[in-house]
C-alpha cells in the first residue's frame, strides 16, 4: 500500500500541490528544450520549489498538532456534539446548546431547523459566541502545549470562500442567462445557481454584493401569471440558499421589493418542494428582528396558515418554523390570530398532529385575548389538560400549562373543568412538582387561583 502523503487529507492543499507540480513540470520541459538557459527560468523554478516546500512544511506542522491533540484526553464539555472534536470557535444556538461554529453552520446551511442535540425547533438561527467556553479551551490548550487555531479540523476550514475571477465570470454569465427571455436558458441557469449556492459560500457572497443581483435572479418570475414550476422551485431555493449566508444577505434579500410577493405566490401556487422551500426561506429571513416586522406586514401569514391547514408532511415543519419565528414579534401575533391560526392549530393539536411544533406557536398566540376566546369556543381546555396529563415531553407539558394558565386567568368559566381534572387526576399538582421550572410556576399559579376561588365560594 502506498504511504499516505502530507496533502492526502486536505483537498485545498492537494489542489495547490498539484498546481505547483504542474508549473515545475512545465519549467523542467522548458529547461530541457532550451539550449540557452535563461536566468528567469531558473528563478521561476526556484520560486515554485520554495512554494511547494512551504506548503509541505505547513501541512506537516498541522499534522503534527493533530497527532498531539489525539494523544491528549479532551474534556467532554470542550467537544462539539456534532464533530466530537475540540471546539475551535464555540457558539451558542437558540436552544442553549454550544457547538463549534463551523459544524453548526454546516448543519444549518443544509436546511436543518432543529437543534442537533435536543431536536428542539429553533425560533431563529442566530449564533452567539460562547466566550466563557472559548477562554476555558484556550487555557486548557496552553496548559497542554496546543495552539488554539483552526488546525483542529483544517480539512473543514473553507479556504475556498475567496471569490475568484472565474467565480465572478461564471456568476455574471448565469445571471445574464437567468434574466434573458429564453425559457430554457432561464431554467438551466436557475438550476446551476441553485446548486452553486448550495455547495459553496462564495456564490452566496456574490449575491450579497448588490441588490441588483437579487432582482436579476427573480426577474423571470416577475412576468406572466403562470411561471414554469421547475424554474420557480430553483429560484425560490436559490433565495433560501442566499439567505442562509449571513445577516447582511438576509437584510438585502428581504428588502428587495420583489422577493416577499414572489414567496407569497410560491406558497400559494408552487409545487410541494417549492412551497416548503419558500417557507424555509421565510423562516431564515425572519431570524432578523427588522425582517420579522417587514415580512409580517406583507400578508404572508395567511398563506402560511393555509399551507399549515393542508398539512402536507413535506412542508409542515418548515411552515411551523416560519410562523413561530414571525410570531416572536408581538405585532405579528395579532395578525396570525386574525388570519385563523388558532382554529388551524387547535384542530391539528387536538388530533395529535405535530404537537411539539404547533403547541409552541399556540403558547405565544394566547397572549392575545381573541386567541383565548377562540380556544374556549374550540373546547381547547380538555385537550390541553390531556396533554398536560399524558404527554411524555416536558416541553409540551410546559406549553400546555402556559396556555391553561392564561385561560384560567382570563376566563373564569373554565375553572370548573380545570378543577374537575385536578380532583380526578391531580394533574396540575403533579406538574407543579415535576415539571420544568416555568411549568411549575404556571401550575402553582393555577392552583393558587383555584384555592382562592374555593375560599371565596365557602366565605360567600
Curated annotation (Swiss-Prot):
First and last residue of the signal peptide: none
A GO CC term assigned to this protein in UniProt: plasma membrane
UniProt ARM repeat ranges: 201-244, 248-287, 289-328
Major site of localization recorded for this protein: nucleus
Subcellular location: Nucleus; Cell membrane
Xref: CDD domains: RING-Ubox_PUB
Keyword Phosphoprotein carried by entry: yes
Enzyme Commission code(s) on record: 2.3.2.27
Catalytic activity of the protein: S-ubiquitinyl-[E2 ubiquitin-conjugating enzyme]-L-cysteine + [acceptor protein]-L-lysine = [E2 ubiquitin-conjugating enzyme]-L-cysteine + N(6)-ubiquitinyl-[acceptor protein]-L-lysine
InterPro entries per UniProt: ARM-like, ARM-type_fold, RING-Ubox_PUB, Ubox_domain, Znf_RING/FYVE/PHD
One of the GO BP terms on file: cellular response to abscisic acid stimulus
Posttranslational mods: Phosphorylated by SD1-6 and SD1-7.
Effect of inactivating the gene: Reduced abscisic acid (ABA) sensitivity during seed germination.
U-box domain mapped to chain residues: 73-147
Keywords: Abscisic acid signaling pathway, Cell membrane, Membrane, Nucleus, Phosphoprotein, Repeat, Transferase, Ubl conjugation pathway
Pathways per UniProt: Protein modification; protein ubiquitination
Keyword Nucleus: yes
SUPFAM superfamilies named among the record's database cross-references: ARM repeat (SSF48371), RING/U-box (SSF57850)
Pfam families xref list: U-box (PF04564)
Gene Ontology molecular function: any one: ubiquitin-protein transferase activity
Job description of the protein: Functions as an E3 ubiquitin ligase. May be involved in the abscisic acid-mediated signaling pathway, at least during germination.
PANTHER family found in the cross-reference section: U BOX DOMAIN-CONTAINING, U-BOX DOMAIN-CONTAINING PROTEIN 9
Subunit structure: Binds to SD11, SD16, SD17, SD18, SD113, SD129 and SD25.
Protein name: U-box domain-containing protein 9
Native organism taxonomy: Eukaryota, Viridiplantae, Streptophyta, Embryophyta, Tracheophyta
Amino acid at each position: 500500500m502506498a504511504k499516505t502523503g502530507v496533502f492526502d487529507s486536505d483537498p485545498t492543499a492537494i489542489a495547490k500541490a498539484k498546481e505547483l507540480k504542474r508549473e515545475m513540470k512545465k519549467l523542467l520541459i522548458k529547461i530541457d528544450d532550451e539550449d540557452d538557459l535563461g536566468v528567469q527560468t531558473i528563478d521561476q523554478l526556484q520560486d515554485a520549489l520554495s512554494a511547494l516546500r512551504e506548503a509541505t512544511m505547513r501541512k506537516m506542522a498541522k499534522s503534527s498538532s493533530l497527532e498531539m491533540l489525539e494523544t491528549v484526553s479532551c474534556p467532554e464539555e470542550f467537544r462539539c456534539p456534532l464533530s466530537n472534536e475540540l471546539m475551535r470557535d464555540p457558539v451558542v444556538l437558540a436552544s442553549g446548546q454550544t457547538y463549534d461554529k463551523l459544524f453548526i453552520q454546516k448543519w444549518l446551511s443544509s436546511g436543518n431547523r432543529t437543534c442537533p442535540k435536543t431536536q428542539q425547533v429553533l425560533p431563529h438561527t442566530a449564533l452567539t459566541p460562547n466566550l466563557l467556553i472559548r477562554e476555558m479551551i484556550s487555557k486548557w490548550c496552553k496548559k497542554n502545549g496546543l495552539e488554539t487555531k483552526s488546525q483542529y479540523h483544517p480539512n473543514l476550514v473553507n479556504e475556498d470562500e475567496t471569490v475568484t475571477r472565474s467565480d465572478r465570470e461564471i456568476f455574471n454569465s448565469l445571471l445574464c442567462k437567468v434574466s434573458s427571455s429564453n425559457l430554457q436558458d432561464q431554467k438551466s441557469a436557475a438550476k446551476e445557481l441553485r446548486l452553486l449556492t448550495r455547495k459553496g459560500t462564495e456564490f452566496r457572497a456574490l449575491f450579497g454584493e448588490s441588490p441588483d443581483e437579487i432582482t436579476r435572479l427573480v426577474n423571470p418570475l416577475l412576468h406572466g401569471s403562470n411561471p414554469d414550476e421547475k424554474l420557480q422551485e430553483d429560484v425560490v431555493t436559490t433565495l433560501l440558499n442566499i439567505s442562509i449566508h449571513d445577516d447582511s444577505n438576509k437584510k438585502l434579500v428581504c428588502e428587495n421589493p420583489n422577493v416577499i410577493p414572489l414567496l407569497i405566490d410560491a406558497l400559494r401556487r408552487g409545487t410541494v418542494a417549492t412551497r416548503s422551500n419558500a417557507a424555509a426561506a421565510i423562516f431564515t429571513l425572519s431570524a432578523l428582528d427588522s425582517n420579522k416586522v417587514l415580512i409580517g406586514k406583507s400578508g404572508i401569514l395567511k398563506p402560511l396558515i393555509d399551507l399549515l391547514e393542508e398539512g402536507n408532511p413535506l412542508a409542515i415543519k418548515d411552515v411551523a418554523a416560519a410562523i413561530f419565528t414571525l410570531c416572536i414579534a408581538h405585532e405579528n401575533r395579532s395578525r396570525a390570530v386574525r388570519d385563523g391560526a388558532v382554529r388551524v392549530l387547535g384542530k391539528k393539536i387536538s388530533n395529535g398532529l405535530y404537537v411539539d411544533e404547533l403547541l409552541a406557536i399556540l403558547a405565544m398566540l394566547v397572549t392575545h385575548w381573541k386567541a383565548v376566546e377562540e380556544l374556549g369556543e374550540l373546547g381547547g381546555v380538555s385537550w390541553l389538560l390531556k396533554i398536560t396529563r399524558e404527554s411524555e415531553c416536558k416541553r409540551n407539558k410546559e406549553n400546555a400549562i402556559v396556555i391553561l394558565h392564561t385561560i384560567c386567568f382570563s376566563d373564569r368559566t373554565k375553572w370548573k373543568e380545570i378543577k374537575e381534572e385536578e380532583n380526578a387526576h391531580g394533574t396540575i399538582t403533579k406538574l407543579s412538582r415535576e415539571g420544568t421550572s416555568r411549568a411549575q410556576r404556571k401550575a402553582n399559579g393555577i392552583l393558587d387561583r383555584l384555592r382562592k376561588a374555593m375560599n371565596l365560594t365557602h366565605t360567600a
